[in-house]
């Protein structure tokens, strides 16, 4: 899941 990839990045920021 690509959308999960960037979503994790946003939450981790």
Curated annotation (Swiss-Prot):
Keyword annotations from UniProtKB, A to Z: Nodulation
Protein's organism: Pisum sativum
InterPro entries reported in the protein's UniProt record: ENOD40 (IPR013186)
Domain of life: Eukaryota
Function statement: Modulates the action of auxin, and may function as plant growth regulator that alters phytohormone responses.
A biological process from GO: nodulation
Native organism taxonomy: Eukaryota, Viridiplantae, Streptophyta, Embryophyta, Tracheophyta
Protein name: Early nodulin-40
């Amino acid at each position: 899941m690509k959308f999960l990839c960037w979503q994790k990045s946003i939450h981790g920021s």
